[in-house]
Amino acid sequence: QSIFLFLLITLSASAQQKITLEEIWGGAFRTQGMDELQSMKNTNQYTVLNFDRASRSMQIDLYDFATLKKVNTLIDTKNFPNLPMIDSYTFNKSEDLILLACNSKPIFRRSFTADYYLYDTKNKQLTQVLDYQIQEPTFSPDGKKLAFAKDNNLFIYTISSQSVEQITNDGVKNRIINGITDWVYEEEFAFVKAFDWNASSDKIAFIRFDESEVPEFTMDVYNQGLYPVQQTFKYPKAGEKNAVV
């Protein structure tokens, strides 16, 4: 009987606890996590992408593994009014340049295009890579260049001169893809980037997909306005031809 009374009192007390709108919208029940955690090379430190709700700004903060305390803030978007919210980031080999991805637009499950910015942690300078969206920009091992894909072709961006060199020319939507996987490889093998630099930063190896003979599939996309937009892409069903690699 005493156990029953104890449970009754406990349940009654818990039932009287109220949840307020201030708690709901103020984040009292928001789960805590770490976004874009990256371990730094040859140090006992790591970086995390944080969001400050009070200032509506984002920071890439440096932490110590041993103490879990913040050591430094590498970049804060509130110091750069023209810098959008950061979706992800990548360091070069020497970890003095940070490649920032912003305004990401999804293509399929893993692929996306984005606006990219380079931040020099030594001189605190921010530079927009290009004034259009690109895919999978990748630092060369010497940190002087970026290889990237756009419109099914591959390009090289030289950081010092901000110049672009096109290295493939036959890329065509729903026909030839250079350096980026087709839908099948992305979906079944879970990767998008199909190119990489050699160790001396003077050559790029890449996979070329010829999907000319792959049947097309068209679907309606309903999230872009009052009326749906049709998206047509190469989609090999069972028994149909796959892309030639």
Please provide the spans of the model-predicted regions.
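Sec-dependent N-terminal signal peptides
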Residues: 1-11
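Beta-propeller folds
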Residues: 15-245
